[in-house]
């Protein structure tokens, strides 16, 4: 937070518990906060505690994610909230971005596909795993941090664990760092990823991927609107 305050970061994304004092601090330097939520109850709590907008993390999102359908999540939040609303969860194409907006989101949150870009500070093996994998290769588990999230099956297997027989985690074992002993850790050894990566077939620059999203968005809009 000291670094964010020093540089007056305009948009701060928060997660795993909305905090009044954090929101007030960001507002003091003129910034806004967007809070990750996995259901309507957490969305309401975030706004009550001063968050400016909501990131609705639906089923299929990379890393920590919820179980709700994106349609159910967006529609319940939109019933009472007209502020900034971003949808996250398996969004990897321009058509999916358009679908998010049609469902009621102001913006779409695209994450996992950027792991496979040239600029991403990720191991080459991680990038290749994203390229080689699809929705069937994503495992939803709370073992690694105590909070449910989506991870690449291959990274779990490479850590010597059985992706189909993982023990349950608990909140008192929350560990989000990559430092530590030889035990497998999220996110150093167990790689997060969303279910939308099936469309990622190569590494490319971030700019070219953004251009691709824009082209796909325009094509999908033309297909739906007939223009």
Report residues per predicted region.
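Active-site entrance/lid segments in N-terminal catalytic domains of soluble metabolic enzymes
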Residues: 1-80, 84
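Conserved active-site-proximal phosphate/metal-binding subdomains
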Residues: 70-86, 92-227
């Amino acid at each position: 937070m000291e670094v964010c305050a020093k540089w007056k970061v305009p948009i701060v994304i928060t997660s795993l518990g909305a905090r009044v004092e954090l929101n007030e601090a960001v507002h003091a330097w003129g910034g806004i906060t967007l809070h990750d939520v996995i259901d309507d109850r957490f969305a309401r709590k975030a706004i009550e505690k001063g968050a400016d907008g909501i990131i609705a993390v639906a089923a299929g999102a990379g890393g920590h994610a919820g179980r709700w359908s994106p349609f159910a999540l967006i529609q319940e939040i939109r019933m009472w909230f007209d502020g900034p609303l971003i949808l996250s969860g398996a969004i990897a194409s321009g058509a999916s971005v358009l679908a998010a907006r049609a469902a009621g989101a102001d913006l779409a949150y695209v994450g996992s596909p950027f792991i496979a870009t040239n600029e991403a500070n990720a191991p080459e093996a991680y990038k290749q795993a994203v390229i080689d994998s699809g929705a069937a290769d994503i495992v939803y588990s709370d073992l690694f941090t105590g909070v449910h999230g989506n991870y690449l099956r291959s990274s779990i297997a490479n850590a010597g664990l059985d992706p189909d027989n993982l023990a349950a985690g608990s909140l008192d074992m929350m560990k989000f760092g990559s430092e530590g002993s030889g035990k497998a850790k999220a996110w150093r050894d167990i790689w997060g990823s969303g279910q939308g990566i099936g469309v990622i077939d190569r590494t490319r620059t971030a700019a070219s991927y953004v251009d691709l999203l824009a082209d796909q968005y325009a094509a999908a809009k033309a297909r739906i609107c007939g223009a």
